[in-house]
Amino acid sequence: MARKTPIDKYRNIGISAHIDAGKTTTTERVLFYTGVNHKIGEVHDGAATMDWMEQEQERGITITSAATTTFWKGMAGNMPEHRINIIDTPGHVDFTIEVERSMRVLDGACMVYCAVGGVQPQSETVWRQANKYQVPRLAFVNKMDRTGANFFKVYEQMRTRLKANPILIQIPIGAEENFKGVVDLVKMKAVYWDEASQGTKFTYEDIPVELQASAEEWCEKMLEAAAESSEELMEKYLGGEGLTEEEIKKALRQRTIANEIVPMLCGTAFKNKGVQAMLDAVVELLPSPLDVPPVPCELEDGTPAVRKASDDEKFSALAFKIMTDPFVGQLIFFRVYSGVMKSGDTIYNPIKGKKERVGRLLQMHANEREEIKEVFAGDIAAAVGLKDATTGETLCDPDSIVVLERMVFPEPVISQAVEPKTKADQEKMGFALNRLAQEDPSFRVKTDEESGQTIISGMGELHLEILVDRMKREFGVEATVGKPQVAYRETIRKTCDEVEGKFVKQSGGRGQYGHVVLKLEPQAPGKGFEFVDAIKGGVVPREYIPAVEKGIIETLNSGVLAGYPVVDVKATLFFGSYHDVDSNENAFKMAGSMAFKDGMRKAAPVLLEPMMAVEVETPEDFMGNVMGDFSSRRGILQGMDDIPGGGKIVRAEVPLAEMFGYSTGLRSLTQGRATYTMEFKHYAEAPKNVAEAVMAAKAK
């Protein structure tokens, strides 16, 4: 079966936004206009096609990114057919991991902003992730029909809060209930969508007189941005020659792909205006797989290489999501970077070192599925029958092995004990938790060795709440959940130049002998643990050095203050001794562990607690209450902003330990009129009284 769409007509994009910016509605409209959905699904009715887990429909928020393939020929039907693969990403901060995964496999993104709320905290997080993976993007300002809608305010916020370089390619005609359509600055025409046809028909008309001056001013800024793409265009522009529509689009495309500008559009997805033009911009301004750099990878021997987006190259793909489908079992979503793969082919997973046979291949459309026979470079599809692959792993041709760069996932900041309600739930719970942890690398499951309890950890209260809920719905496991626990850490503040660990056992027969001397030093926050081998003259034989490191690493799991994991310490092994007969790996492992524990005690150990960046949007009357409450929660105020049309945004850094149950507290402080978002910022040293209380609680 030959390729249906040439690769230069592919667009792999994400639609990304803050909660409630109307992203799922926007995606729904995209599916409607591209002819896939004949009845528009409304999030308000809990019927949206992309939000396909029961919980998402109940909560009205998107949790898992569904991948959908659609086709578009332009809103006027005059473009060659393009294949748009859309990954719908969640906007809630507890699901940042989902956004991060999808950014990794996208070529471009549409950032959806609310015309009233503007650039909100989560928008900044998503923006940083898109910067990290250098994803070219467009901005779509949605909800132009809402009271308080202000397109130009969002433009200013993008410049100040995101440090972006937005370029308007449209301006709105009216706002709030008077929002009628847009002025297309490239064509310098007004565009009106027909409401009776749900926006499938539209007309170009002259620009309203009252907008002419504003349209000319913004058009000039856009032309200047386009002209900066090359010297010849700049000369033409400065010489007073007009630029053709073709030249403008080509120049804007070039600068968008280079991440130098962010073209900005507007509309209201709910009222069927503007999404059609956004789709045109996706095709005209965002990159195809050929426009982005070839994917970097490593060969088997570790040499860096690249794989080009071509069917003629050997097959390579990246698994970016695992989902359990009620009908076909486990689905692995992957992005093909190079080559072709057919169902039934054998592929290799270099991270696991295993070959696997691909069962069925599915093209997903939200939660509908179509079986396909093969996938080509640039495709996003799902495979059934891969048992070993997990998120972030490479799938490649067994005869040409490469590893695409691995994804790095954040450490969880919150834990809860979870217990099955009945004996029958016990086994099912283990299975369910492992399945969920496989799907979501930011969710961890472990058994507490002392209490025997099962501990689940994640990125926030909502994250864990939803996972426990899924356990009940999808796996039928009833579980009781303990109080949330903070994931504290321990580290040291001083250097301990010399600390000795000696493990000697003499009890008849062969003894045990291991002796090491370490130096411990604090590392910069976030640097993690580092082991340095500085042994000279073989005082500790080569073969025992890994055992010393292993002993230290095992000790890292449980610090000396309250048994929390130890971070940001450098341990240098520089001296020791051994015995010809009695020394063995175990003895050196024990010696390493003893030395490290002793060194920790001498190096001014401290307790670290996770600090959260909290933003509260509140009416002005309650601002004093909110700020006073932050102080009582050991919060440090970071600043305030005005919300146009009244209200304030208060920003603070607050220890996670003080934030449990905050949503209830905030509701009663502000009569339910404030909203907040919270995300993990960094670890900071806990004050002495807090550390003592945590240690006392652990000692009980």
Swiss-Prot record:
Cellular component terms (Gene Ontology): cytoplasm
Record key words, sorted: Cytoplasm, Elongation factor, GTP-binding, Nucleotide-binding, Protein biosynthesis
Cellular localization per UniProt: Cytoplasm
Top-level taxonomic group: Bacteria
GO molecular function: GTP binding; GTPase activity; guanosine tetraphosphate binding; translation elongation factor activity
Gene3D superfamilies: 3.30.230.10, 3.30.70.240, Elongation Factor G (Translational Gtpase), domain 3, P-loop containing nucleotide triphosphate hydrolases, Translation factors
InterPro entries cross-referenced by the UniProt entry: EFG_II, EFG_III, EFG_III/V, EFG_IV, EFG_V, EFG_V-like, EFTu-like_2, G_TR_CS
One of the protein's GO biological processes: ribosome disassembly
Positions of GTP binding: 17-24, 88-92, 142-145
Domain tr-type G: 8-290
Pfam families the UniProt entry points to: EFG_C, EFG_III, EFG_IV, GTP_EFTU, GTP_EFTU_D2
CDD domains in the cross-refs: EF-G (cd01886), EFG_III (cd16262), EFG_mtEFG1_IV (cd01434), EFG_mtEFG_C (cd03713), EFG_mtEFG_II (cd04088)
Family stated for the protein in its record: Belongs to the TRAFAC class translation factor GTPase superfamily. Classic translation factor GTPase family. EF-G/EF-2 subfamily.
NCBIfam families linked to this entry: EF-G (TIGR00484), PRK12740.1-5 (NF009381), small_GTP (TIGR00231)
Function recorded in the entry: Catalyzes the GTP-dependent ribosomal translocation step during translation elongation. During this step, the ribosome changes from the pre-translocational (PRE) to the post-translocational (POST) state as the newly formed A-site-bound peptidyl-tRNA and P-site-bound deacylated tRNA move to the P and E sites, respectively. Catalyzes the coordinated movement of the two tRNA molecules, the mRNA and conformational changes in the ribosome.
Identification of the protein by name: Elongation factor G
UniProt source species: Polynucleobacter necessarius subsp. necessarius (strain STIR1)
